[in-house]
Amino acid sequence: MRDYRDIIIKPVVTEKSMNLLADNKYTFIVDKRANKTEIKNAIENIFEVRVASVNTMNIKGKPKRMGRFEGKKPDRKKAVISLKPGHKIRLFEGM
């Protein structure tokens, strides 16, 4: 079993994710190999909250160029976490 801190990579701070905070939903970039159960357990253990549901989406990397060299941004996985009423993640307070 992997460490919980290896599953949750970083929070997503965008206008859309900040609007979801009103609905008690939090957005994170997570490990591509993680499933919903692992993500739920990681959030509950790291932030000590109760998770109601987890929605995930795979995001393909955009193609990029550096002069004549072509490449692409890495693929990633995003998770939208819905918490049970009365629970909040303090990391997002004041944003």
Swiss-Prot record:
Keywords: Ribonucleoprotein, Ribosomal protein, RNA-binding, rRNA-binding. One of its GO terms (cellular component) is ribosome. GO terms for molecular function: rRNA binding; structural constituent of ribosome. One of its GO terms (biological process) is translation. SUPFAM superfamilies: Ribosomal proteins S24e, L23 and L15e (SSF54189). It comes from the Bacteria. Part of the 50S ribosomal subunit. Contacts protein L29, and trigger factor when it is bound to the ribosome. One of the early assembly proteins it binds 23S rRNA. One of the proteins that surrounds the polypeptide exit tunnel on the outside of the ribosome. Forms the main docking site for trigger factor binding to the ribosome. Belongs to the universal ribosomal protein uL23 family. This is Large ribosomal subunit protein uL23. It comes from Syntrophomonas wolfei subsp. wolfei (strain DSM 2245B / Goettingen).
